[in-house]
Regions:
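Conserved alpha-helical scaffold segments that buttress catalytic/binding sites
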Residues: 1-186
Length: 186
C-alpha cells in the first residue's frame, strides 16, 4: 500500500511500463510479527500467485518488505517450471549478503537471512516444502553476485553445494561485464 500511496504506479506509467496491482499481500492489521507461521502463510500465498502468473506466461514483479518474500516468489516459479518440459529454475542473486542461513546457523533467527538455503532445500521443513516438496533450485543453476558480508556457515554450505559466488572483490578485479557474462553462461 505504501508504494501505491507514493505514486509508484504513476511513475511506472510515465516510463511506459504497463502495471497494475494484481495482488497485495500484507500482514494482518497491526501484525508486526515475523513469526515462522506468518512467514510461511504469506509465502504460501505468494507462491500460489507467482505459480499462476508463470502458468499464464505473465511477467511480474514482486516488491517485498524483506528477503523472506523470495521464498514464496521462487517456490511458485519453480513449481510452475517443474510442470514444463525441461523447466528448471536458474537464479542470479545480486546482493551483498548470501542469505543462506538456517535456524541452526543464524545468530539472529531472522528468516530474511534464509531464503537461499530454503530454496536449496535446507532449513525448516515448513519453509522448504512451500509449493513443492523438494529443493526449488539446483545449486549448479544458482549464481551469487556482489557478496561482501556473510558468515562462515553460509559460505561453507554454498561452497559444499558448488554454488558459483562472485564477491564484490571479484567484480572489482574482473569487471561487472565479465562477471555477468560468466553468470549467464553458467
Amino acid at each position: 500500500m505504501q508504494l501505491q500511496n507514493n505514486r509508484l504506479e504513476q511513475k511506472l506509467s510515465e516510463h511506459h511500463l504497463p502495471n497494475h496491482w494484481q495482488a497485495i499481500l500484507k500482514p494482518r492489521s497491526g501484525d508486526k510479527s515475523h513469526s515462522l507461521q506468518r512467514v510461511v502463510e504469506l509465502n504460501t500465498e505468494l507462491a500460489a500467485i507467482t505459480y499462476d502468473l508463470i502458468q499464464q506466461h505473465q511477467p511480474f514483479a514482486v516488491l517485498g518488505g524483506d528477503h523472506s518474500c523470495a521464498i514464496g516468489t521462487w517456490s511458485g516459479v519453480a513449481a510452475a517450471l517443474a510442470q514444463q518440459q525441461n523447466g528448471e529454475l536458474g537464479l542470479i542473486w545480486i546482493d551483498a549478503h548470501m542469505d543462506s542461513h538456517t535456524f541452526e546457523t543464524t545468530a539472529t533467527g531472522n528468516i530474511h537471512g534464509m531464503p537461499l538455503a530454503t530454496l536449496l532445500g535446507y532449513g525448516d521443513t515448513t519453509l522448504t516444502q512451500i509449493a513443492i516438496p523438494r529443493p526449488k533450485i539446483n545449486p549448479k543453476r544458482l549464481v551469487l553476485i556482489g557478496t561482501r558480508s556473510f558468515e562462515t556457515e553460509e559460505e561453507k554450505l554454498l561452497q559444499r553445494l558448488g554454488v558459483r559466488i562472485y564477491t564484490m572483490q571479484a567484480i572489482v578485479q574482473r569487471g561487472l561485464d565479465t562477471v555477468f557474462s560468466e553468470a549467464i553462461a553458467y
